[in-house]
A protein has these predicted regions:
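A generic structural signal for short, non-catalytic loop/turn and secondary-structure boundary residues
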Residues: 1-2, 35-38, 81
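Short, extreme N-terminal segment that most often corresponds to the first beta-strand
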Residues: 1-25
Length: 113
């Protein structure tokens, strides 16, 4: 096991609606909730933070929200204007998993993106 917890953000319908509505080219294939929640970004956090997840989210939701939005559109003019905790909660479900087992016999490499 590793000394981290995993936070997984899953989109709710309003997030997907924004992705489709904000598309500046209007040529996307119609992104769906099901297709986009199959492979989600995983954020590793301290085990201690997982025990106080609501507090951790309150401190970090802005960065998480912007990271998820920027994955779709880098043009900030397309981003929702009032990115507050209420909107975050309406658009995104948060899962936290505290048992992570590394099954690979090799060094973890951070590509520093």
């Amino acid at each position: 096991m590793i000394n981290r917890a995993a936070v997984i953000l899953k989109y709710k319908a309003p997030f997907i609606q924004w992705v489709n509505d904000a598309d500046p080219y209007k040529d996307n294939p119609g992104i769906t909730l099901e297709s986009e929640n199959k492979d989600c970004t995983v954020y590793l956090i301290l085990e201690e933070d997982a025990e106080k997840l609501e507090e951790w989210i309150s401190l970090n939701f802005e960065q998480l929200f912007e990271s998820e939005i920027e994955d779709w559109y880098t043009d900030e003019s397309l981003w929702p204007k009032n990115r507050n905790r209420k909107l975050f909660d309406e658009w995104i479900d948060v899962e936290c998993h505290s048992v992570l087992i590394d099954t690979v016999d090799g060094k973890i490499i951070d590509d520093e993106i």
